[in-house]
């Protein structure tokens, strides 16, 4: 199979979908890998690193898309839609529930769209989303601490406090991978941390994991309202695989927060959980204020730490890429149920129910689509 690795064009997206070691593994299996010039530079991989691993370097974006399978990091932008073609395998983060134009373009061009974020193991874990959730979660606490500084627009609070001064209060909505990793860093910074989740069993697991050092509270509108009001930093870390993120924090709740408090919405790439994060920000211009509250709503947070993120992503995606390349997408999807759950579009049909509901489009179940 011929596999293309484009250079990411999203604002300050410095990750690349495969490291040279990943390329080498595919080439060793007999596949051809084409890498767009400078695709790895943001992650400190030189073109020569890829050629030594067995890849070919091309100058034109069109060349790297004229392949059997394209591996990316982030969803294609509109200027890349022109390269879609029937039967092209697109293996990347798609987040289609918040991307109607992209969804329609994939369907119209009969692209085989396989989303990293909806590949799901029998225990319901998301192996290709987990590494980036870990990165984004850890970053969220660091970013929140940064923007609480006065010169960054915050209220001038040190999360860890000092002797005689109260710690900063952090509320994390969602106790999954991102929320758990946010809590680890927030605790490390010395903050007073509360985690809200809808699953009592998960709350018990978090109590045990953190040895009682975090407050765990059932997530419901009343508890969310109270925690949001009392917090200096609120982190949104809720995920429903494939579906649009639920709107859990209303504008009225945000209005009750103190001036200079900070919101970090990790779920913004799926629409966000805050009513007031109504637009996506960028690494160039990461925050905006509403009702005196600093909002951080960057959809590609791990792109700011590309070396770590690229290697972690490569480690997770490579085994699945090898299956797709060696077996072809149809047999690979039929043989691997976890991978088949990543299938979002095929032959002009939408195969993710959460996306179909979010965009009010017709849905075809995966089993029928693969017959």
Curated annotation (Swiss-Prot):
User: Which Pfam families does the record match to this protein?
Assistant: AlaDh_PNT_C, AlaDh_PNT_N
Among the GO biological process terms of this entry, one is:
L-alanine catabolic process
Give the active-site positions: 95 (proton donor/acceptor), 269 (proton donor/acceptor)
Q: Which InterPro entries match?
A: Ala_DH, Ala_DH/PNT_CS2, AlaDH/PNT_N, AlaDH/PNT_NAD(H)-bd, NAD(P)-bd_dom_sf
Catalytic reaction annotation: L-alanine + NAD(+) + H2O = pyruvate + NH4(+) + NADH + H(+)
* EC number(s) reported in the record: 1.4.1.1
Residues engaged in binding substrate: 15, 74
Q: Which PANTHER family match?
A: ALANINE DEHYDROGENASE
Functionally, this protein is described as follows: Catalyzes the reversible reductive amination of pyruvate to L-alanine. May play a role in cell wall synthesis as L-alanine is an important constituent of the peptidoglycan layer.
The Swiss-Prot or TrEMBL record describes its family as follows: Belongs to the AlaDH/PNT family.
Listed name of the protein:
Alanine dehydrogenase
């Amino acid at each position: 199979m011929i596999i293309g690795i484009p250079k990411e064009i999203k604002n300050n997206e410095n990750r690349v979908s495969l490291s040279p070691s990943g390329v080498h593994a595919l080439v060793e299996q007999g596949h051809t890998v084409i890498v767009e010039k400078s695709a790895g530079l943001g992650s400190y991989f030189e073109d020569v690193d890829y050629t030594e691993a067995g890849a070919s370097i091309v100058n034109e974006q069109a060349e790297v898309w004229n392949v059997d399978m394209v591996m990316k990091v982030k969803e294609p932008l509109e200027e890349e839609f022109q390269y879609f073609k029937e039967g092209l395998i697109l293996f990347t983060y798609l987040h289609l529930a918040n991307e109607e134009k992209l969804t329609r373009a994939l369907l119209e061009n009969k692209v085989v769209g396989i989303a990293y974020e909806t590949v799901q193991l029998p225990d319901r874990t998301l192996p290709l989303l987990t590494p980036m959730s870990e990165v984004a979660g850890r970053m969220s606490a660091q970013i929140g601490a940064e923007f609480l500084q006065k010169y960054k627009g915050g209220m001038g609070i040190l999360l860890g406090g000092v002797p005689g001064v109260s710690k900063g209060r952090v509320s994390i909505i969602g106790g999954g991978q991102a929320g758990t990793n946010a809590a680890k860093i927030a605790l490390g910074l010395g903050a007073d941390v509360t985690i809200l989740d809808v699953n009592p069993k998960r709350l018990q697991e978090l109590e045990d994991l953190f040895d009682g050092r975090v407050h765990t509270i059932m997530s419901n509108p009343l508890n969310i309202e109270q925690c949001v009001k009392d917090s200096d930093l609120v982190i949104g870390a809720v995920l429903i695989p494939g579906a649009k993120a639920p709107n859990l924090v209303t504008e009225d709740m945000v209005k009750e927060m103190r001036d200079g408090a900070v919101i970090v919405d990790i779920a913004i790439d799926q629409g966000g959980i805050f009513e007031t994060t109504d637009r996506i920000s960028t690494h160039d211009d990461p925050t905006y204020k509403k009702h005196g509250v600093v909002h951080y709503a960057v959809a590609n947070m791990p792109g700011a730490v590309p070396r770590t993120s690229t290697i972690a992503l490569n480690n997770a995606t490579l085994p699945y890429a090898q299956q797709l390349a060696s077996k072809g997408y149809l047999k690979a999807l039929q043989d691997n149920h976890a991978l088949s759950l990543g299938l979002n579009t095929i032959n002009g049909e939408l195969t993710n129910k959460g996306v179909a509901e979010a965009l009010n489009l017709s849905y075809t179940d995966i089993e029928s689509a693969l017959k």
